[in-house]
Amino acid sequence: MTTQNPVYASQAKPWLKYYDQKFIDQTLPALSAFEYVCQRSKNHLNDTALEYYGRKFTYADLIVNVKKTAAALRGAGVKKGDIITVVSIMTPEIIALFYAADMMGATLNLVDPRYSVEGIREYIEEVDSHLLVCLNVVYDRCSQAARRTNVEKVIVLSPADSLPPAMAAGYKLTSPDKNKYASNVIRWKKFMAGGKDQSTAAEPYDPDHACVVVHTGGTTGSPKGVMLTDDCFNGIALQFQAYPKLFHRGQKLMNVMPPFIAYGFACGIHLPLVLGFTVIIIPNLDPAKLGSLVLKHKPEHMFGVPTHYQQLASDPKLRDKDLSFITNYAAGGDSLSRGAEQTVNDFLAAHGARYPIAKGYGMTEVSSAATVAAGLDNKPGSVGIPMVHTVVAAFE
């Protein structure tokens, strides 16, 4: 009598029946994250890539800004292999900085601006940064954190740097910058001017290059820094192309997630730019205004946490509104109870949305999602099926 070896799901991959063969056969491009955005947008350079408080940046604008920022980094002494610590919310400058560091072989160490002086210092020392980039509103904490570290220069940016002119003037009147800056501080505009005579050449693609260091939430232990490569970011963007009924060039995604988590940058910025979306940047979300923002911008897509969608479902401003533009509003980053999921799904259906709330399961180490429940392949209480090039297995 012979005993057959069991065929494990991780070998048989039964979830592939949900995907078209052309997506199963796709291979990861040997490109940096920035090169992938450039390749995908080369015939759509006049499309809008980013929108920030009404100011729009085309894909051509984005690419030019990235190259200018790379030149400025070289002017500030940044070299291939350097790790730059960034303490900021999401702004157009941070997006350009991410791709600029990526194209020149450097890495961003993304830190939550709410951290204490000691917390920021710990993350600076962890990667031995010589350059620190921070938001002006957290400069005081960052300058204290940088003491007794190897930080030589501090680049300071303002949320107003990319605002439309009238709005920027109003912001500076209502929120004047009262910081007393040290001699090693360079303001963003001066930093950019320092790249005038510097190279904008890109380093060759390196499969081992880490484009970011992000820090885990400590769910399975103490928080730790995770290095994510270009392939990690591009892998997420490639796999989401396997949902052609949901994702189309020219759609809008409202980004409400911060840059210092993998979910925020991989799904909230890189993924939509690779797919040809317009990313509407909401840098510091007031949850009470989420419903108004959805009505104003009418984004087909949003990546958020469960509480965002519970907030929408209970918002009286949305009570009689048509939300049929909603295509894929996805919840991640926290657990979603069956009751809360049903409440949100009832709300979406009552307001004309075609699909229930999308869900996923993953971790920082996989750049966010490993499994996805989206569109009509979405069972209540389930975290979905593995993404097309992801292998999932259960271990005791």
Label the model's feature ranges:
Residues 52-57, 69-115, 127, 136, ...:
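Conserved AMP-binding/adenylate-forming
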Residues 63-68, 193-198, 207, 226-247, ...:
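Conserved structural elements of the adenylate-forming
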Residues 234-252, 260-303, 311, 315:
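Conserved AMP-binding/adenylation subdomain of ANL enzymes
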